[in-house]
Each structure stands twice: as structure tokens, then as C-alpha cells.
Amino acid sequence: MSAFDRYLHTVLLAAQAEARDDGSAAIEARHALLAVAAQDGTEPQRVLAAAGLGPAELKAALDREFAHSLGAAGVAPGAFDLHATPDPDHRPRPGASLRLALDRMAGSHRKKDLTPLHLLHALLAAEVGTVPRALDLAGVDRAALAARVREGL
């Protein structure tokens, strides 16, 4: 197994745990981004941290996006005291946003040339969805962040 394969496996397992912990039915790009940010000592983690996007900051941005989306639907986030009850036996499978990111990554380079930064680049490349909305609400310059990732590729 290559170094990238080990990295991807670790990220996907961490993303699965994130999805399970928040009661999600599927592993989405947001879970993978949180997992990438939590991989201490990796280049993607350093790029995100340099942009002020550690795991806690990303989680806060994703929570703001969720509240904003509920508000757009006319629902106040605090109106209900509903919390997900994680099922330790539930094994979420990759959802649409994660599959799209993985497809973007796989389509951009040969497998043997992939690095952890390619995964981050693919996660940040989404034009629509939870991740770009969360980053926009957090005031992140997504174009500058993507450019910084591309510099490292």
C-alpha cells in the first residue's frame, strides 16, 4: 500500500467516524474535510491551519452553515433540542459530495502521482454544497486557499 493509499484510508476512516458521530446517513465532503484538518503533520493540515482552518474552526464554520441553511428554510436552529444519537454499529458509506470529490481527484492525475494535497484540492474544488457555503460564511477566500493548495501540488 502506497503512502497516499494509507493517508486516504486514514482520512476515510476518520471521516466515517465524523459522519457517525453527527448522525449522518453518509460520509460527505464536510466529514472528509474535517478528517483532513485533523491529520497532524500533513501538508493539507498545515495549509488549512495557515488559513486559520483547524478542526475546531472548520466545525464552527460547518455549524454556522447548518444554522444558516435552516434559517433559509424558516427554521430557527435553537427551536428544537434534537441531537443525533450516534449508533456505534452504523457504518456510513460515501455520499454524493464525497464521491464527487474523489472522482475529481482521480480524474486529475494518475493514481501513482496522487498526494494528500490532491485530496484537499478536490474537496475545495466544489462550486456548490456544504463545504463552499461553510467556507464562504466563515469569510475564507476560497480562490486564494485553492491557489495555495495548487502551489504545493
Where in this protein do the model-derived segments appear?
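Histone-fold recognition with a strong bias for associated Lys/Arg-rich disordered tails
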Residues: M1-L153
